[in-house]
Amino acid sequence: MGELVKTIAKALVDNPDAVEVNEIHGHQSIIIELKVAPEDMGKVIGKQGRIAQAIRTLVKAAALKEKKRVIVEII
C-alpha cells in the first residue's frame, strides 16, 4: 500500500524525488507516513483537503482485501 501512495503522490507533485513513504505495521493497522517537499504540500492536500481525502479513500479500499485498518498521515 505504500507503493500505491508513493505512485499517486509522485504524479501530483513538482518534485517527485522528494516523495518519501514510511510504513509502520501494527497488529491490526498500518500507518503510512507520506513526506513531500514543503512547496508541494498544497498539491497533495488539495482544496479543502479533497485530494488527501481521495488518497485515503483509495488506500482504505485497497486495505479491505487485507482486512487491515490504514491511516495515511501527510507530513
Curated annotation (Swiss-Prot):
Q: Which residues form the KH domain?
A: 29-75
The principal localisation class reads cytoplasm
Localization per Swiss-Prot or TrEMBL: Cytoplasm
Keywords for the protein's UniProt record, in alphabetical order:
Cell shape, Cell wall biogenesis/degradation, Chaperone, Cytoplasm, RNA-binding
> Which Gene3D superfamilies does the entry link to?
3.30.300.20
The molecular function GO annotations come to: RNA binding
Q: Name one GO cellular component term.
A: cytoplasm
Disulfide pattern? none
Listed under GO biological process in this entry are: cell wall organization; peptidoglycan biosynthetic process; regulation of cell shape
Q: What PANTHER family does the record point to? A: RNA-BINDING PROTEIN KHPA, UPF0109 PROTEIN SCO5592
Q: Which NCBIfam families match?
A: PRK00468.1
The record's HAMAP family line, in alphabetical order, gives: KhpA
User: What is its biological role?
Assistant: A probable RNA chaperone. Forms a complex with KhpB which binds to cellular RNA and controls its expression. Plays a role in peptidoglycan (PG) homeostasis and cell length regulation.
Q: How does it assemble?
A: Forms a complex with KhpB.
Family to which the UniProt record says this protein belongs: Belongs to the KhpA RNA-binding protein family.
The protein in question is named RNA-binding protein KhpA
What is the originating organism of this protein? Caldanaerobacter subterraneus subsp. tengcongensis (strain DSM 15242 / JCM 11007 / NBRC 100824 / MB4) (Thermoanaerobacter tengcongensis)
